[in-house]
Amino acid sequence: MIEVENLYFDYTDFKGEKIELLKDISFKIESKERVVLLGVNGSGKSTLLKILNALVFPKRGSYIYKGMRIRKRGFKKISRSFRKDISFLMQDPNMLLFNATVREEIEFGLREFGFDDIEKRVEETAKRFGLEKYLETPPFYLSGGEKQRVALASLVAIEPEVLLMDEPSANLDPPTTEWLMDLLRELDITTVISTHNLALAQKFGDRALVLSDNHTLLFDGLLKEFLKNEELMGEAKLLHRYG
């Protein structure tokens, strides 16, 4: 479903120096896999998620989705179907909330992609996410965790095939995090999450992609095998987070 091969990403800073964020990254993700993306701050996790969502494009290497090479040139022709297929929940939910009410947030994607029975779908989605009493509320009045629910509800409502999530538990209390994990298992779609929370990672998925602090792919395999390998954990600088 997703194939990344020899992918590089860099940018030039204000001093004219090249800053490398991803170097020679290769992996494949099959349909309905649940993958945890691990690594210290600055290792390139958020950048990789942005590439998978085509918010930025590789400088070298390839990103292939369903047999289509995803690159800047020609992306406009496939952007509509791609945006319907792949949803991205950013760490800051405010980046996804721009409508007057929670109802309008959930409606937006449904209208954009031509769904039928929009009102019914909004009501069902609101109930699923515990948002019924907030439907007429402006999102900016809500707490961080509630905003996260609204943003996720608006993405799930359009029935994506792939869900990307950057630190999804950052604004959530433990009970809501447990609810989120249950929801993701129930959705049964391809899901990739980045997280620093190794306890959450173990509850979420079996497979891990681990980025090193020099922006390469350090590990691709079973999460339980990575967590048992103290040498790799130390190299990833994640050993202190597990215990």
What are these regions (language model features)?
Residues 138-142, 146:
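Conserved ABC ATPase signature
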Residues 117-134:
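Conserved ABC ATPase "signature" region
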Residues 163-166:
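Catalytic Walker B motif of ABC-type/P-loop ATPase nucleotide-binding domains
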Residues 61-72, 82:
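Conserved ABC transporter NBD signature motif
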Residues 53:
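Helix-to-loop junction immediately C-terminal to a conserved catalytic motif
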Residues 215-239:
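Conserved beta-strand-loop-alpha-helix hinge in the C-terminal portion
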Residues 195-196:
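H-loop/switch region of ABC-family ATPase nucleotide-binding domains
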